[in-house]
Amino acid sequence: MSYCSGVAISADEGITMRNGRAKALQEHSPDQVATPLLPQVPPQEQQDLNPQQQQQQQQQQQATPQKQAMSADEKKATKKSLVIVAGIFVASLVTMCYVYAIFPELNASEKQHLKIPRDIQDAKMLAKVLDRYKDMYYFEVMFGVVVAYVFLQTFAIPGSLFLSILLGFLYKFPIALFLICFCSALGATLCYTLSNLVGRRLIRHFWPKKTSEWSKHVEEYRDSLFNYMLFLRMTPILPNWFINLASPVIGVPLHIFALGTFCGVAPPSVIAIQAGKTLQKMTSSSEAFSWTSMGILMACACASLLPGLLKNKFKHKKEA
């Protein structure tokens, strides 16, 4: 009896102990057991951390421009700008026709060559025609070439290289160099204006992220923009039509753009003028640029960057 009772008592105690351990395990989850091993963060700091992260995310989203639909006013302004550009283009064509009308009387064989040259053969034939009338109609011939040059530059139409070679053939070096620099600067400035009128709104609408990145670079190197404009005009890294269209969109000032263009096109123009002196012997426009001339151009381009690089270096040292 006592033996059975002892056994019963032991069994009850064992059951009680097992139930107690099971209850303890249920009350303490694995996460709660492992929690003391990890660094404790006060609840108040955890509550403050989430709003900060949300604020940072909102700032990042606001800093990155997103493509948005154009408003009704923006669409109306864009259409109006396109109409103005179309009107300017038509007016330019009328001016070209006027130049053709005031030109001296040509025979049938000469009239077919009076056009904007598309290759070196066209440039040769046009040079022969203009050279024949240049002495008697000096300013008429010059005005016609200048108008054609500015027209090509304004509307980003290829062909200005052949006109540069043509000017080198027709006129003495100082006159030809000034005319090329003047026409390039004037035409590029007009293209800049047209892009500012229409392109700025469209480019920022379709490529907001790229536009924002380029604008930041321009702002970062604003003190050296003239040097960078010289470099771009001297080298074929970016086509001139792209520089003309993109500059107003990313915030390049007009006076720096125009002056940088006038001075920057001078070194390549010297090569084109020298090629014009041997125009009738050329078989391709690529003959105008030899490895030697390209090396000289690159040296001039690198030299134009040097003042800007030194200025930025001293600026960063001063800020540090």
From Swiss-Prot:
The keyword Transmembrane helix applies. It is a multi-pass membrane protein. Residues 20-72 are annotated as: Disordered. Residues 43-68 have a biased composition (Low complexity). Pfam families: VTT_dom. GO terms for biological process: autophagosome assembly; nervous system development; positive regulation of synaptic transmission, cholinergic. It is found in: Membrane. One of its GO terms (cellular component) is endoplasmic reticulum membrane. Keywords: Membrane, Neurogenesis, Transmembrane, Transmembrane helix. Its main location: membrane. The chain crosses the membrane at residues 83-103, 141-161, 173-195, 225-242, 245-265, 289-309. Required in cholinergic neurons, but not in motor neurons, for normal neurotransmitter release by motor neurons. Involved in muscle growth. Belongs to the TMEM41 family. This is Transmembrane protein 41 homolog.
